[in-house]
């Protein structure tokens, strides 16, 4: 593994311009010492200038493990270092303790404890904001830990920014190029930019705020859509792959046994092949609707499959193949020109939860597009008996997949370029 991350990049950046850091709080339990939060602000030597991660808990039987964070003490110590520090990290800790203790709590007691902890955090945040000058400060609220299964099944972590130059609305960054979605890699560059520190040895980009009405509703909507696509992706592609393999075996059997393709079995096989060819388009078109539950996802698939099956019965196979192929190419072209808005929530698109890619063409989509581009070239060659138009289409396909502001997929570019050279 050649990946060598720079440990302590944010701390080094801040220390390089003479500013100081601080860290308060912990997620300790009565059995384990958990103090990983300070890793965010430490420098490459593991140093933080101020803080208290040791003597910061109170005994309280109403809280998990009988302990809770002493927010009054944190506020008091923050006041004493306010003028000396430029970056302060606070690990509230209590929600982490609740999460690890939740197996021992009934649902009712769990929610009671959670509401109690959230109330404490809310009061603490309010007290902090009251002591901050908004025009000289930035407050970042984030929950980078795994979600609690009893609350929701979201695998995306929330992030809230407050302070100078931050509009009411949603967040984005050039790392993701998606409204409402940022990467955890963007946190350090955002802090460094605000403090006018160098952004060095950091992989992300500064977060930007976008003024947008109905921000909460929008975030909830895309969170649900992203979650459903992520949950159904592997199972959908697995089933699709298995059906394709079974269909191929069926086709081999039909041709080996020299079964007449004009009888009922042959016609069924042809329609099945046509439907399988249309499945990626069905997955794309169904994602255009507000699919926020697995039930809606399955219903939309059934509707589109029924619709395509009806079309396949009404028109000849060759005409359907031409129509579907042209529709595919048009959809992919429009999708790239519209920054991926058509395929954004499709199971064939990239998954922001995984974080391997946020824009451009993912490998699944490139695989489909490679087949479509070569088929289009073949159809045009058959229609016009001339290589010029097919070659132009293939070269356009290479640009679509390879351009950094469009497909941005190196492997896909090489594959389509190879197909183009072979065609020529």
Task: Describe these PLM feature segments.
Residues 284, 398-403, 421:
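Alpha-helical transmembrane segments of multipass membrane proteins
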Residues 287-293, 401-411:
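Membrane-interface helix caps and helix-loop-helix hairpins in membrane proteins
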Residues 1-232:
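Soluble extramembrane regions of membrane proteins in the secretory/endomembrane system
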Residues 52, 350-358:
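Amphipathic, glycine/alanine/valine-rich membrane-attaching segments
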Residues 139, 393-397, 413-424:
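Hydrophobic alpha-helical segments of polytopic membrane proteins
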Residues 111, 115-118, 174-181, 271, ...:
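Hydrophobic alpha-helical scaffolding
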Residues 319-322, 384-399:
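Short hydrophobic alpha-helices at membrane interfaces in multi-pass membrane enzymes
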């Amino acid at each position: 593994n050649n990946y060598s991350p720079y440990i302590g990049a944010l701390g080094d950046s801040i220390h390089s311009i003479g500013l100081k850091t601080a860290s308060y709080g912990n997620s300790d339990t009565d059995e384990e010492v958990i103090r990983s939060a300070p890793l965010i602000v430490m420098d490459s030597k593991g140093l933080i200038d101020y803080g208290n991660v040791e003597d910061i808990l109170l005994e309280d039987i109403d809280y998990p493990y009988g302990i809770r964070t002493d927010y009054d003490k944190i506020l008091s110590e923050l006041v004493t270092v306010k003028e000396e520090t430029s970056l302060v990290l606070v690990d509230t800790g209590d929600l982490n303790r609740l999460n690890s203790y939740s197996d021992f709590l009934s649902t009712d007691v769990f929610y009671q404890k959670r509401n109690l902890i959230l109330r404490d955090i809310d009061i603490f945040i309010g007290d902090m904001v009251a002591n901050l000058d908004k025009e000289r400060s930035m407050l970042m609220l984030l929950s980078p830990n795994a979600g609690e299964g009893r609350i929701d099944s979201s695998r995306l972590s929330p992030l809230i920014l407050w302070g100078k130059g931050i509009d009411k609305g949603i967040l984005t960054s050039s790392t993701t190029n998606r409204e409402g979605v940022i990467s955890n890699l963007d946190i350090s560059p955002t802090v460094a930019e605000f403090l006018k520190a160098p952004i060095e040895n950091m992989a992300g980009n500064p977060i930007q705020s976008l003024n947008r009405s109905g921000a909460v509703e929008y975030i909830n909507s895309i969170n649900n859509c992203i979650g459903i696509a992520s949950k159904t992706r592997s199972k959908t592609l697995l089933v699709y792959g298995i059906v394709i393999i079974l269909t191929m075996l069926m086709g081999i059997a039909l041709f080996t046994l020299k079964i007449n393709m004009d009888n009922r079995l042959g016609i069924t096989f042809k329609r099945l092949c046509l439907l399988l060819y249309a499945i990626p388009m069905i997955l794309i078109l169904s994602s255009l609707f507000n699919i926020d539950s697995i039930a809606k996802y399955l219903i939309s698939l059934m509707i589109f499959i029924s619709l395509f099956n009806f079309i396949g019965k009404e028109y000849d196979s060759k005409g359907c193949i031409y129509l579907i192929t042209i529709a595919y190419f048009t959809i992919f072209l429009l999708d790239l020109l519209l920054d991926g808005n058509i395929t954004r929530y499709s199971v064939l698109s990239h998954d922001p939860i995984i974080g391997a890619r946020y824009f451009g063409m993912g490998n699944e989509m490139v695989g489909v597009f490679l087949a479509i581009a070569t088929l289009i070239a073949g159809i045009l060659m058959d229609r016009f008996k001339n290589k010029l138009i097919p070659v132009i289409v293939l070269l356009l396909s290479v640009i679509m997949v390879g351009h950094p502001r469009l497909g941005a997929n190196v492997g896909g570019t090489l594959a389509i370029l190879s197909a183009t050279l072979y065609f020529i």
